[in-house]
Amino acid sequence: MRIGNEYAAKTLCKAVQACYNFSVYTEDGTNETTGRSYMENKLIRSKYFLYLTEFFAGMSVMAVELGASRLMAPYFSSSQIVWTVIIGVIMIAMAIGNVWGGKLADKSATPDKLYRRLIIAAIWIALIPFVGRYLIAGISLLLALFVTKNFLVWAALAACLVIFAFPCVLLGTVTPSLTRFTVDNLDDTGKTVGRLNALNTIGSIIGTFVPTFVTIPAVGTAATFLIFSGVLAAIGIAYFVFEKKKSVPGIVSVLLIAGLCFALPSYSFAFWQSDITLEDESIYNYLQVQDDAKRTTLSTNVLFGVQSVQVKGDALTGMYYDYALAAPCMAGMDGTDNENRSVMILGMGSGTYASYCTRYFPGASVQGAEIDKKIADIAKDYFGLPGSVTVAVEDGRAYLAASKEKFDVIMVDAYQDITIPFQLSSVEFFNEVQAHLKPNGVMVVNLNMTSAENGSINEYLCDTMAS
């Protein structure tokens, strides 16, 4: 009876293989249907295609990691906490993929399954920017009902696990599988594995630089995901085309990625808003400008807050920003003649403070340092930054270190999302600022928070300045 059942099972398996063009391999890599070993495949035997696969797999992992930070930044910021969550989740996923991939390689030595996994990973990655924004919003709203402490950490962790873990697990299976296919004998095992790791690392390096400096500033985060998912899909499809085998996931990936490309022009991070004047991305930030009858605002990496506000007409904002205009008065400047007077703004942003200084303290020289060139351009194009204001596109601290000029007022207003960069809140930095102040000069710092409690950030920062 048992023999009959085994025979029936094998017959059924062969029928399924015949219907769906599946290939089943034994542990030594022999196809049970054709009797051919995968080593008879010219594409596999040459190894160059395998090395190319390793290269693009490494590149895609880093592209996903960089893309993850940009996708999550508008919702959770791009702070060190969020970066830690992203890196940790992806490393855990890769480790799981390594273990699983090793077991799969030993159990069934077939390239078909590896390249099918690559195509599935490509499909998932292509969907991330379009589905991920809804998942992030949904996960955040759900956790807000239960989490009362460390919400940012838990929400970022949950979103990262749901969105990015699965494709990274699949990509983690690549190296163990390729090791099985590329190692011919024990004499060159070390050389072969070393070559695979080197190509993976080189791919990772390219996957780090290209998104940051090329694709994200040029075409955006969503298009970056599509580009690298397309590369992964192309590798998988190329294998099946060369092998003259059908691949349903391959067909799906082509149709999906092509369709999503047409959806790019209408893509928006802030899918719930319809009154956005400008939505753009730079090397440093996600940028959003909103303009209405009363005011113009700039948001960077934060969808539910603003970094700069400019009220239409000659009115002040009516917010705490306006208090910074007391600094020039404290330095002896007035509303008439301010020749030989100067104001330096570190973190100029949209130039709101610079515009007010030129309006209320005519004749004063107003300069600004802004690390993000696109923000400097936005200041001119959308916030009407006066042409008399000089803007240096570089880091504020680096600008001071290279300058010998002294100022009557130095405004420190540099922010990374919702936090003050640590390099602009140290004793060394404040000593640098003091060295660039004229006698009776004034430094004004935008803290963006208030607290009367002991041990608050205000208290610590004031102690740092005083030291």
Predicted regions and their residues:
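Short, conserved active-site loop motifs that form the nucleotide-linked donor/cofactor pocket
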Residues: 388-390
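Conserved phosphate-coordination/catalytic loops
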Residues: 63, 314-319, 394, 423-427
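Alpha-helical transmembrane segments of multi-pass membrane proteins
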Residues: 16-280, 291-294, 302-307, 329-342, ...
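Short, surface-exposed charged micro-motifs
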Residues: 286-288
